Amino acid sequence: MPNILTKKQAIEFLGTDEKIFDNYFKNAGEFKALPRQNNRGFFKFDQSELERWRDDYKWRTIELTFEDYAKCLDFALAQHFRGYVLSDWGTARQREFGQKITNWVKGQLAEVAVQKFFKNEFNKEVELDFKIYDDIVPQDIISVTDETGKRAPRIGVGIKSSKPKSAYLVLGENEISLEGRRSDVYIFCRPDMPDDHLLRLTKEKVIEAVQGQQHFPSYQDKMPDFQNMTCEIAGWCAVGELERVTSIPGQEFENGPRFVKKTGDLHRSREKWEELISQL
């Protein structure tokens, strides 16, 4: 007999929060509830299915070290100080420094995570491009090492990232419609990087600056330390498998359609990863 869990029990079993659970269940289709009579009543879940999902999630999740973070932060700062402008999707609003650096670091951490994932799980070495360019560079893997040595990839691979709660890989129309910006395959990652990473990095200096101030005692024991991060390699899809839409659950795209794939439909089994690696 299967062990049946309520939604609350399922959330506790997976050790996640309700918003992430709902996104993965309702929007992403990463796991299913048991059938309900006339689609009514409380959601219930088979524990064994959730366990399979959790185990699959764990083997695709990579630990990122301080050295990985430092490499990505260096790239982000180089981008910032060369005057590069990162705008919100489809708007002219510039993002403030903290958000801009955070987004760049997350993007690079995703690339490092894919590199480590390929090496750890499939013994495949790939090289990333951490150079700074004037134009957008669509391909994130610039070389592959095989029995003949180092060579250029046979296909273009774009590595995209978003927050852990994200249920969709989302790409702007120009990224797909313009041939010079399009990749053959997209890998989607969900790095779990705290928004206060810069505070964690500079904790000692911040304490030095504010200790003795009026409110310091109220938060001095709450300031977090820097810790290793994780990044889930959520899956991949070919460019032709993306869907052109004007909205996804909870979000209308204001400035034209986007190309998307919900994470539950991404390729993520070991066999599918081996298939992708054989194409590189």
Residues of each region from the PLM?
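Helix-turn-helix/winged-helix DNA-binding modules
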Residues: 2-3, 42
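Nucleic-acid endonuclease domains
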Residues: 12-15, 19-27, 48-138, 143-153, ...
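Well-ordered beta-strand positions in beta-sheet-rich domains
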Residues: 42, 154-156
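Residues within the helices of the helix-turn-helix
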Residues: 5-8
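Short helix-start
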Residues: 32-57
